[in-house]
């Protein structure tokens, strides 16, 4: 998720992702797949009760070409998991997926995992952009074996040693990146490759692409 951020970004995004289109993929959107980010007082991420928050002074957000991006993903063979559950077989491994639309925007409607199969899957994977506690709780209750998420940027601006100050959701900043465990379920939260285009800086939180190997 959060793939676009700018109205003109789609061609560049597809060029960057092109090598990955050779592999099977699933996707879910984040808020910056729908709406362009806005310039805000950065202290709002630390103190949500700022005067600007209370007054609701934000301008109307700019809509991004979300449908066009998703159509391009579909044409390259990836599968959207936008409040959707489905089963895929990848290299002989049967995977049940459950994905939700962006929890940060409260667009999430959990579909559970596929139930219309006689044989169980080899693994059940939950996918969400923002790792809100309600989302992780639901995946755990539905029987996920592992959950993948992003959104937090790993804190983006961290203390020495990588300790995040904020998570931009209700997850404790101390566990807002990397492989954590929630209600007995492994959750991998990528700190991502980018940053807000209005705050193009990372401090003690380098860009990251994650390769996770699942084993029996």
Language-model-detected regions and their locations in the chain:
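Short, conserved loop/helix-junction motifs that constitute active-site signature segments
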Residues: 17-22, 117-120, 139-142
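Core catalytic region of metal-dependent phosphoesterases/phosphodiesterases
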Residues: 1-89
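Short, hinge-like loop/turn segments at secondary-structure boundaries
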Residues: 43-47, 115, 165-167
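Proline-centered loop/turn at the N-terminus of a beta-strand
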Residues: 24-26, 79, 96, 123-125, ...
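Charged helix-capping and loop-helix junction motifs
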Residues: 10-18, 112, 165, 171-172
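Binuclear metal-dependent hydrolase catalytic cores centered on His/Asp/Glu-rich metal-binding motifs
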Residues: 47-78, 82-84, 90-137, 199-202
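Active-site environment of divalent metal-dependent phosphoester hydrolases
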Residues: 4-8, 32-39, 61, 81-90, ...
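Conserved beta-sheet core of the metallophosphoesterase superfamily
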Residues: 131-211
